[in-house]
Amino acid sequence: MEVILLEKVANLGSLGDKVKVKAGYGRNFLLPYGKAVPATEANVKAFEERRAELEKAAAEKLAAAQARAEALEGASFTITSKAGEEGKLFGSIGVRDIADAVSTGGTEVEKSEVRLPEGPIRVTGEYDIELQLHTDVEVTIKLAVVAE
Protein backbone atom coordinates (compact mmCIF):
# COMPACT_ATOMS: atom_id res chain seq x y z
CA MET A 1 0.00 0.00 0.00
CA GLU A 2 1.39 3.40 -0.97
CA VAL A 3 0.57 6.41 1.19
CA ILE A 4 1.49 10.09 1.41
CA LEU A 5 2.54 11.15 4.90
CA LEU A 6 0.74 14.19 6.33
CA GLU A 7 3.19 14.54 9.23
CA LYS A 8 6.53 13.15 10.34
CA VAL A 9 6.29 9.51 11.39
CA ALA A 10 9.18 7.94 13.31
CA ASN A 11 11.18 5.36 11.34
CA LEU A 12 9.08 5.96 8.22
CA GLY A 13 9.46 9.45 6.77
CA SER A 14 8.51 13.09 7.00
CA LEU A 15 5.73 15.32 5.68
CA GLY A 16 5.01 14.77 1.99
CA ASP A 17 6.97 11.55 1.59
CA LYS A 18 5.36 8.91 -0.59
CA VAL A 19 6.12 5.61 1.13
CA LYS A 20 5.14 2.00 0.73
CA VAL A 21 3.80 0.38 3.92
CA LYS A 22 2.14 -2.89 4.79
CA ALA A 23 -1.62 -2.77 4.28
CA GLY A 24 -2.43 -3.39 7.95
CA TYR A 25 -0.13 -0.62 9.18
CA GLY A 26 -1.69 1.81 6.74
CA ARG A 27 -5.31 0.80 7.36
CA ASN A 28 -5.11 0.38 11.13
CA PHE A 29 -2.72 3.15 12.18
CA LEU A 30 -1.70 5.72 9.59
CA LEU A 31 -5.08 6.38 7.96
CA PRO A 32 -7.34 6.39 11.08
CA TYR A 33 -4.99 8.71 13.01
CA GLY A 34 -4.73 11.15 10.10
CA LYS A 35 -1.01 10.62 9.66
CA ALA A 36 -1.32 9.64 5.98
CA VAL A 37 -3.66 9.41 2.98
CA PRO A 38 -3.68 6.76 0.23
CA ALA A 39 -1.44 7.76 -2.69
CA THR A 40 -4.11 8.14 -5.39
CA GLU A 41 -3.78 10.78 -8.11
CA ALA A 42 -6.59 12.86 -6.57
CA ASN A 43 -4.96 12.72 -3.12
CA VAL A 44 -1.56 13.68 -4.57
CA LYS A 45 -3.09 16.80 -6.17
CA ALA A 46 -5.03 17.67 -3.01
CA PHE A 47 -1.90 17.21 -0.91
CA GLU A 48 0.16 19.51 -3.14
CA GLU A 49 -2.50 22.21 -2.71
CA ARG A 50 -2.43 21.83 1.10
CA ARG A 51 1.34 21.32 1.42
CA ALA A 52 2.15 24.86 2.67
CA GLU A 53 -0.66 24.72 5.24
CA LEU A 54 0.52 21.32 6.53
CA GLU A 55 4.16 22.44 6.69
CA LYS A 56 3.14 25.52 8.68
CA ALA A 57 1.15 23.38 11.14
CA ALA A 58 4.10 20.98 11.52
CA ALA A 59 6.46 23.90 12.19
CA GLU A 60 4.07 25.27 14.85
CA LYS A 61 3.92 21.86 16.58
CA LEU A 62 7.72 21.65 16.58
CA ALA A 63 8.07 25.19 17.98
CA ALA A 64 5.55 24.44 20.74
CA ALA A 65 7.39 21.23 21.65
CA GLN A 66 10.73 23.08 21.75
CA ALA A 67 9.24 25.75 24.04
CA ARG A 68 7.96 23.04 26.39
CA ALA A 69 11.39 21.37 26.30
CA GLU A 70 13.10 24.62 27.29
CA ALA A 71 10.69 25.02 30.20
CA LEU A 72 11.42 21.47 31.39
CA GLU A 73 15.19 21.47 30.80
CA GLY A 74 16.98 20.62 34.04
CA ALA A 75 13.74 20.50 36.03
CA SER A 76 13.36 18.09 38.93
CA PHE A 77 10.20 16.62 40.41
CA THR A 78 9.42 14.60 43.52
CA ILE A 79 6.86 11.85 43.96
CA THR A 80 6.08 10.44 47.40
CA SER A 81 4.80 6.91 47.72
CA LYS A 82 4.38 4.33 50.44
CA ALA A 83 7.43 2.11 50.69
CA GLY A 84 8.77 -0.74 52.80
CA GLU A 85 11.92 -0.87 54.93
CA GLU A 86 14.39 -1.35 52.08
CA GLY A 87 12.89 1.32 49.83
CA LYS A 88 10.71 -1.06 47.84
CA LEU A 89 7.46 0.65 46.86
CA PHE A 90 4.03 -0.74 47.63
CA GLY A 91 2.84 -0.58 44.03
CA SER A 92 4.79 1.26 41.36
CA ILE A 93 5.26 4.64 39.71
CA GLY A 94 4.14 4.52 36.07
CA VAL A 95 3.98 6.92 33.15
CA ARG A 96 0.64 8.39 34.29
CA ASP A 97 2.04 9.26 37.73
CA ILE A 98 5.09 10.93 36.19
CA ALA A 99 2.98 12.86 33.65
CA ASP A 100 0.70 14.09 36.45
CA ALA A 101 3.68 15.20 38.58
CA VAL A 102 5.24 17.12 35.69
CA SER A 103 1.90 18.66 34.69
CA THR A 104 1.32 19.99 38.22
CA GLY A 105 4.65 21.80 37.79
CA GLY A 106 3.07 23.98 35.10
CA THR A 107 4.05 22.32 31.82
CA GLU A 108 1.46 19.95 30.37
CA VAL A 109 2.82 16.49 29.53
CA GLU A 110 0.82 13.56 28.17
CA LYS A 111 1.47 10.07 29.49
CA SER A 112 2.35 8.93 25.96
CA GLU A 113 5.31 11.36 25.99
CA VAL A 114 6.97 9.73 29.03
CA ARG A 115 9.57 7.07 28.20
CA LEU A 116 10.28 4.34 30.77
CA PRO A 117 12.35 1.75 28.86
CA GLU A 118 12.88 -0.39 31.97
CA GLY A 119 9.22 -0.38 32.97
CA PRO A 120 7.54 1.17 36.01
CA ILE A 121 9.62 2.42 38.94
CA ARG A 122 9.39 0.08 41.94
CA VAL A 123 12.19 1.36 44.23
CA THR A 124 12.81 4.73 45.89
CA GLY A 125 15.68 6.82 44.54
CA GLU A 126 16.57 9.38 41.88
CA TYR A 127 15.92 8.71 38.22
CA ASP A 128 16.58 10.45 34.91
CA ILE A 129 13.33 10.31 32.94
CA GLU A 130 13.23 10.97 29.22
CA LEU A 131 10.27 12.82 27.73
CA GLN A 132 9.71 12.69 23.98
CA LEU A 133 7.65 15.80 23.31
CA HIS A 134 7.89 15.52 19.50
CA THR A 135 9.61 13.11 17.14
CA ASP A 136 12.54 15.58 17.04
CA VAL A 137 12.37 16.96 20.60
CA GLU A 138 13.47 15.01 23.66
CA VAL A 139 14.23 16.34 27.15
CA THR A 140 15.48 14.65 30.31
CA ILE A 141 14.11 15.52 33.73
CA LYS A 142 15.14 14.37 37.20
CA LEU A 143 12.62 12.47 39.29
CA ALA A 144 13.05 11.71 42.98
CA VAL A 145 10.89 8.96 44.43
CA VAL A 146 10.75 9.21 48.22
CA ALA A 147 8.97 7.17 50.88
CA GLU A 148 6.07 8.69 52.82
Curated annotation (Swiss-Prot):
This is Large ribosomal subunit protein bL9. SUPFAM superfamilies: L9 N-domain-like, Ribosomal protein L9 C-domain. Signal peptide: none annotated. GO terms for biological process: translation. The keyword Transferase does not apply. The gene is rplI. NCBIfam families: L9 (TIGR00158). Belongs to the bacterial ribosomal protein bL9 family. Keywords: Ribonucleoprotein, Ribosomal protein, RNA-binding, rRNA-binding. The keyword Ribosomal protein applies. InterPro entries: Ribosomal_bL9 (IPR000244), Ribosomal_bL9/RNase_H1_N (IPR009027), Ribosomal_bL9_bac/chp (IPR020594), Ribosomal_bL9_C (IPR020069), Ribosomal_bL9_C_sf (IPR036791), Ribosomal_bL9_N (IPR020070), Ribosomal_bL9_N_sf (IPR036935). HAMAP family: Ribosomal_bL9. GO terms for molecular function: rRNA binding; structural constituent of ribosome. It comes from Marinobacter nauticus (strain ATCC 700491 / DSM 11845 / VT8). One of its GO terms (cellular component) is ribonucleoprotein complex. Binds to the 23S rRNA.
